[in-house]
From Swiss-Prot:
<dbReference type="GO" id="GO:0042777">
    <property type="term" value="P:proton motive force-driven plasma membrane ATP synthesis"/>
</dbReference>
<keyword id="KW-0406">Ion transport</keyword>
<dbReference type="GO" id="GO:0005524">
    <property type="term" value="F:ATP binding"/>
</dbReference>
<keyword id="KW-0997">Cell inner membrane</keyword>
<keyword id="KW-0066">ATP synthesis</keyword>
<keyword id="KW-0375">Hydrogen ion transport</keyword>
<dbReference type="InterPro" id="IPR023632">
    <property type="entry name" value="ATP_synth_F1_gsu_CS"/>
</dbReference>
<keyword id="KW-1003">Cell membrane</keyword>
<comment type="subunit">
    <text>F-type ATPases have 2 components, CF(1) - the catalytic core - and CF(0) - the membrane proton channel. CF(1) has five subunits: alpha(3), beta(3), gamma(1), delta(1), epsilon(1). CF(0) has three main subunits: a, b and c.</text>
</comment>
<dbReference type="GO" id="GO:0045259">
    <property type="term" value="C:proton-transporting ATP synthase complex"/>
</dbReference>
<keyword id="KW-0139">CF(1)</keyword>
<dbReference type="GO" id="GO:0015986">
    <property type="term" value="P:proton motive force-driven ATP synthesis"/>
</dbReference>
<keyword id="KW-0472">Membrane</keyword>
<dbReference type="GO" id="GO:0046933">
    <property type="term" value="F:proton-transporting ATP synthase activity, rotational mechanism"/>
</dbReference>
<dbReference type="GO" id="GO:0005886">
    <property type="term" value="C:plasma membrane"/>
</dbReference>
<dbReference type="InterPro" id="IPR000131">
    <property type="entry name" value="ATP_synth_F1_gsu"/>
</dbReference>
<dbReference type="Pfam" id="PF00231">
    <property type="entry name" value="ATP-synt"/>
</dbReference>
Length: 288
């Protein structure tokens, strides 16, 4: 059994770590609330433009944008959103597993895979795995802006325009609630038609485009892609802070349990030392 002094040192070390994890839990909780506000502020725009795009995809347009055209999927692209920092449980690895499973499905069909990566954790993971990475960006901080994402998104859109990609997917963590974050894969291109049967059945009209459909749709479809990627980034950020808060709370609770266990061991060691000293005193007195 370790000595009382050694155990006391361990208890002090665990208490110091517990203070750090408690502080990180409180910081993550504060950042999560701000991230949730940003996510909820941008979500109505992202959802509305997605509905508009759903109508456009179902419409009989006089101008057919290339993003609306289905083609054989020989080259598939993914925009993968991860965190820049760790200590957030299995958030990133669960996302990577889902992405890899989907990629493997396409590879079995003979498709080539190309990635654009947002976040240092995904950058390190996929670069080390030998994946073909066309663009990467990290260090977006706690308040990412659309301007920070345009470069990586633009690379993938240019490849799609040139026919170097036939499908484009967005991979991110969807914020369900504080305890649940779900990895999700959304199809960006070609434009997914609405999943709503009611919309498809009732959609018997078209928009009136002013001045011309081509420039309007070109701008609208670009905004759609940018808004979906940005929404994925802010949702992933809210997931990161929620996962970190939960992980740090678990670490703090585990530290409390460990301190209790060490305190019990310390008390036993101290009791054994006192018993030994008393035995030595009694033995010495008897010898006299």
């Amino acid at each position: 059994m370790a000595g009382a002094k050694e155990i006391r040192t361990k208890i002090g070390s665990v208490k110091s770590t517990q203070k750090i994890t408690k502080a990180m839990e409180m910081v993550a909780a504060s950042k999560m609330r701000r991230s949730q506000d940003a996510m909820e502020s941008s979500r109505p725009y992202a959802q509305t433009i997605r509905k508009v795009i759903g109508h456009v995809a179902n419409a009989s347009l006089e101008y057919r944008h290339p993003y609306l055209e289905e083609r054989e999927a020989k080259r598939v692209g993914y925009i993968i959103i991860s965190t820049d920092r760790g200590l957030c449980g299995g958030l990133n690895i669960n996302l990577f597993k889902k992405a890899i499973t989907d990629m493997q499905t396409w590879k079995e069909k003979g498709a080539q895979i190309e990635l654009a990566i947002i976040g240092s954790k995904a950058t390190a993971f996929f670069n080390n795995s030998g994946a073909k990475v066309a663009a990467q960006v990290s260090g977006l901080g706690d308040s990412p802006s659309l301007e920070d994402l345009i470069g990586s998104v633009g690379v993938m859109l240019k490849k799609y325009d040139k026919g170097e990609l036939d499908r484009l997917y967005l991979v991110f963590n969807q914020f369900v609630n504080t305890m649940v974050q779900k990895p999700k894969i959304d199809q960006l291109l070609p434009l997914p038609k609405s999943d709503s049967e009611d919309m498809q059945r009732d959609h018997m009209w078209d928009y009136i485009y002013e001045p011309e459909p081509k420039p309007l749709l070109d701008a609208l479809l670009l905004r759609f892609i940018e808004s979906q990627v940005y929404q994925g980034v802010v949702e992933n950020l809210a997931c990161e802070q929620a996962a970190r808060m939960v992980a740090m709370k678990a670490a703090t609770d585990n530290a409390s349990n460990l301190i209790d266990d060490l305190q019990l061991v310390y008390n036993k060691a101290r009791q054994a030392a006192i018993t030994q000293e008393l035995s030595e005193i009694v033995g010495g007195a008897a010898a006299v």
